């Protein structure tokens, strides 16, 4: 993401002009734009025209509109963002108050104005504009006949390809059908890797599976690379890391990211940090349950006692339509930081973020037990807020 201009007043009102450059930047933008903001961007509008003979036709024109945002729709796999609202600035083609939907596009700038820029949103802009926060991990999660090729960016896990091939069982004395199907499966996975993984960007490619599937696949991959003199694969051989996963489904990626070998190799990535923080929370919940709580009310009480060591919070909570509720989460984050606690904002598009959402989206590891919280522990599991 490129920051073109930033003009925010002392009362935190103001506007920023940004240019999304990567598909992931559309996800950041989705987290920046909120109902009630004003958005100015270039868009296509269908307009009616009348010729000198009186015949009416229509054509599409590119114009710049400023909308008061009413609805936001994000397609995570296509990384497309549509913003619907009413026009609030005079325009040659669109009346004041008329509805329009702007589809924000990569490499086309937009200006976003807010009455209140909070700390969470401003921090996201900083992160989005930092070139170090780029996609740096790829993963092939597989079992016989099923594979998911994923990109793990700092903000989301993107499934780039799914490969499914029916593998017949081995029969006594006749394995040819099984072997042919397996080779066809491996070949499709290799093609998907070459099509979807940018080797000049990724630091590491995880190959995760149960049993010996990953070893057999990697043997096939590099035998074929030698046979076909595939320099791209051979030069990047050191980036491939084999780890265990219980299945070829996307959710098994979390197991791969938890592997100590992977964790040390990816220690500087946000995704690995999220996985470790959630893992630490579950361990604390199991071994010292009076120092691990989830649910907003419980966590707020722990914060009042200045007991929070690590706050785990889902980014989807900052997209809440109700301004007061959204502000409540922002205040919690600011307060934990002021009290020297660590704040981990989880992406709801990561496997770890999905798990945190099942725990109400907010959890905390405490520095020390808070007696009144321990007495109410039973309430947290039913708490939704």
UniProtKB/Swiss-Prot annotation:
Localisation per UniProt entry: Cytoplasm
Annotated GO biological process: cell division; chromosome organization; endoderm development; inner cell mass cell proliferation; mesenchymal to epithelial transition; nonfunctional rRNA decay; nuclear-transcribed mRNA catabolic process, no-go decay; nuclear-transcribed mRNA catabolic process, non-stop decay
Keyword Metal-binding: yes
Top-level taxon in the UniProt lineage: Eukaryota
Keywords, comma-separated and alphabetical: Cell cycle, Cell division, Cytoplasm, Isopeptide bond, Metal-binding, Phosphoprotein, Translation regulation, Ubl conjugation
Record has Flavoprotein as a keyword: no
Tissues with expression: Ubiquitously expressed.
Gene3D superfamilies: 3.30.1330.30, eRF1 domain 2, Pelota, domain A
Result, substituting residue 45 to A: Abolished ability to rescue stalled ribosomes
Phosphoserine modification, residue list: 374, 380-382
Cross-link (Glycyl lysine isopeptide (Lys-Gly) (interchain with G-Cter in SUMO2)), chain numbering: 162
A molecular-function term among this protein's GO annotations: nucleoside-triphosphatase regulator activity
Entry GO CC: cytoplasm; cytosolic ribosome; Dom34-Hbs1 complex
SUPFAM superfamilies: Dom34/Pelota N-terminal domain-like, L30e-like, Translational machinery components
Cofactors demanded by this protein: a divalent metal cation
Function: Component of the Pelota-HBS1L complex, a complex that recognizes stalled ribosomes and triggers the No-Go Decay (NGD) pathway. In the Pelota-HBS1L complex, PELO recognizes ribosomes stalled at the 3' end of an mRNA and engages stalled ribosomes by destabilizing mRNA in the mRNA channel. Following mRNA extraction from stalled ribosomes by the SKI complex, the Pelota-HBS1L complex promotes recruitment of ABCE1, which drives the disassembly of stalled ribosomes, followed by degradation of damaged mRNAs as part of the NGD pathway.
Subunit structure: Component of the Pelota-HBS1L complex, also named Dom34-Hbs1 complex, composed of PELO and HBS1L. Interacts with PINK1. Interacts with ABCE1. Interacts with CNOT4.
Family: Belongs to the eukaryotic release factor 1 family. Pelota subfamily.
Protein name: Protein pelota homolog
Organism: Homo sapiens
Taxon lineage: Eukaryota, Metazoa, Chordata, Craniata, Vertebrata
């Amino acid at each position: 993401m490129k920051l073109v201009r930033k003009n925010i007043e002392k009362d935190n009102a103001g506007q920023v002009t940004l240019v999304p450059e990567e598909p992931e930047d559309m996800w950041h933008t989705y987290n920046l734009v909120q109902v009630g903001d004003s958005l100015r961007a270039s868009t296509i509008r269908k307009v009616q025209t009348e010729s000198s003979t009186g015949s009416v036709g229509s054509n599409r024109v590119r114009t710049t509109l400023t909308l008061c945002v009413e609805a936001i729709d994000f397609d995570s796999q296509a990384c497309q963002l549509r913003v619907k609202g009413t026009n609030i600035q005079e325009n040659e083609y669109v009346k004041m108050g008329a509805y329009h939907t702007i589809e924000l596009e990569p490499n086309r700038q937009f200006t976003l104005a807010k009455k209140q820029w909070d700390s969470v949103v401003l921090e996201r802009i900083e992160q989005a504009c930092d070139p170090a926060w780029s996609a740096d991990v790829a993963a092939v999660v597989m079992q016989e006949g099923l594979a998911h090729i994923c990109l793990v960016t700092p903000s989301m896990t993107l499934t780039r390809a799914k490969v499914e091939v029916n593998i017949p069982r081995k029969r006594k004395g006749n394995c040819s059908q099984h072997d042919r199907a397996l080779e066809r499966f491996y070949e499709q996975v290799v093609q998907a890797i070459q099509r979807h993984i940018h080797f000049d960007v990724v630091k590491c490619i995880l190959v995760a599976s149960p049993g010996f599937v990953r070893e057999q696949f990697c043997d096939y991959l590099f035998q074929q690379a030698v046979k076909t003199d595939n320099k791209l694969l051979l030069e990047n051989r050191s980036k491939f890391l084999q780890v265990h996963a219980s299945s070829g489904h996307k959710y098994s990626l979390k197991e791969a990211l938890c592997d100590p070998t992977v964790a040390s190799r990816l220690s500087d990535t946000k995704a690995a940090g999220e996985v470790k923080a959630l893992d630490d929370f579950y361990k604390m919940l199991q071994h010292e349950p009076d120092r691990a709580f989830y649910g907003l009310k419980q966590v707020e009480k722990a914060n009042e006692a200045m007991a929070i060591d690590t706050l785990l919070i889902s980014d989807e909570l900052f997209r809440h339509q109700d301004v007061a509720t959204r502000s409540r989460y922002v205040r919690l984050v600011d307060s934990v930081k002021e009290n020297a606690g660590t704040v981990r904002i989880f992406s709801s598009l990561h496997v770890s973020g999905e798990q945190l959402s099942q725990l109400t989206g907010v959890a905390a590891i405490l520095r020390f037990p808070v007696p009144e919280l321990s007495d109410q522990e039973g309430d947290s599991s039913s708490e939704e807020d």
